[in-house]
């Protein structure tokens, strides 16, 4: 199971970390994903869901 939101598709984003000298090194920003039990098509499953999807009510915990 990949670290991707099952509802919104949010996942880690990449970019650069900048030092004071403006040197660039690659880094990642992870999405705020929670592993929750939800009902999908009548079955209870454990999936990764973003905190934003949980707060907005797009999915409900079981």
UniProtKB/Swiss-Prot annotation:
Alphabetized GO MF terms: structural constituent of ribosome
Keyword match Ribosomal protein: yes
The entry's keywords: Ribonucleoprotein, Ribosomal protein
Pfam families according to UniProt: Ribosomal_L28 (PF00830)
GO cellular component, one term: ribosome
UniProt-annotated stretches for the region Disordered: 1-28
GO annotation, biological process: translation
InterPro entries with a match to the protein in the record: Bacterial_rp_bL28, Ribosomal_bL28, Ribosomal_bL28/bL31-like_sf, Ribosomal_bL28_bact-type, Ribosomal_bL28_sf
Family from the record: Belongs to the bacterial ribosomal protein bL28 family.
Protein name stated in the entry: Large ribosomal subunit protein bL28
Species in which this protein is naturally found: Bacillus cereus (strain ATCC 14579 / DSM 31 / CCUG 7414 / JCM 2152 / NBRC 15305 / NCIMB 9373 / NCTC 2599 / NRRL B-3711)
